[in-house]
Design a protein with these regions (language model features):
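N-terminal secretory/membrane targeting signals
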Residues: 1-24
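Hydrophobic alpha-helical segments and their helix-loop boundaries in membrane
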Residues: 22-250
């Protein structure tokens, strides 16, 4: 009991010693609220902050829709479905592999953006608008290489703009949906080629089971081992990844 009382006195003494120094401390005043813009510059700065916050919020979608991610993840998902292995590989593995391959394929484009736009802007050598113009150009060049003329002509016509004479005349808001449509078309074309051998195995296994009178035995359960052994023997992941990466090199 005496020990507890002594400890209480000790803490009380320390508190009384620290209290004067705490009273002398000054704390910053933080105000969060809406204030009227007194000058056009204040309004412009606030609008720029709002735009940048919106861009940061949409950054994952921008990364997905302006790079090769769409084609990669669709083909990998169709490959998993063709194998008939259920959720193997899991979605995290499919998405992670597609994301890693995206950074690998887009590395030259990202390096060009870093050298021509980001680094000069960080060193205050160019203005913000110049950095944006330089940064978007490598992305536009990449999208143009993968965009089909049919899809581009469709959105140019739907946008009701004058027929572009050069690539620079094509607005980004027209190029972006054209690129996405082209990527989906290419992805499903590759997916069909990948799906076909596994479909043949399913048909053969089903025919054999019907001829043997085993109509109530699920064909997918029998076909799965044959699909897996064929996929491993031909080094399927190597061929698919190799074909996907090379499809962006033109």
């Amino acid at each position: 009991m005496n020990i507890m009382r002594k400890l209480g006195y000790l803490f009380l003494g320390l508190f009384m010693t620290i209290l004067p120094s705490c009273a002398a401390m000054t704390f910053p005043n933080i105000n969060i609220g809406l204030q009227n813009a007194n000058t056009p510059q204040d309004f412009t700065n606030g609008l720029q902050i709002l735009i940048w916050l919106t861009i940061l919020t949409l950054a994952p979608s921008i990364l997905i829709l302006t790079t090769c991610f769409v084609r990669l993840v669709v083909v990998l998902a169709l490959t998993r479905q063709a194998l008939g292995a259920g959720t193997l590989p899991p979605n995290q593995v499919i998405t992670g592999l597609a994301l890693i391959l995206t950074f690998f394929i887009m590395a030259p484009t990202f390096n060009e953006i870093n050298e021509k736009a980001l680094q000069p802007y960080m060193k205050n050598q160019i203005t913000q608008q110049v950095a944006i113009d330089r940064g978007i150009q490598p992305i536009r060049n990449f999208m143009f290489k993968q965009t089909h003329e049919k899809e581009l002509a469709l959105f140019v016509r739907m946008a009701k703009i004058e027929k572009p004479k050069t690539k620079e005349d094509v607005p980004t808001y027209v190029l972006l949906p054209s690129f996405i449509m082209s990527e989906l078309k290419t992805a499903f074309t590759i997916g069909f080629v990948v799906y076909l051998p596994f479909l043949v195995i399913d048909i053969v296994v089903s025919s054999v089971l019907v001829s043997m009178g085993m109509m109530f035995l699920p064909p997918t359960m029998i076909a799965l081992p044959f699909k897996l052994i064929m996929f491993v023997m031909v080094d399927g992941w190597y061929l698919i990844v190799k074909s996907l990466v090379e499809s962006f090199v033109k």
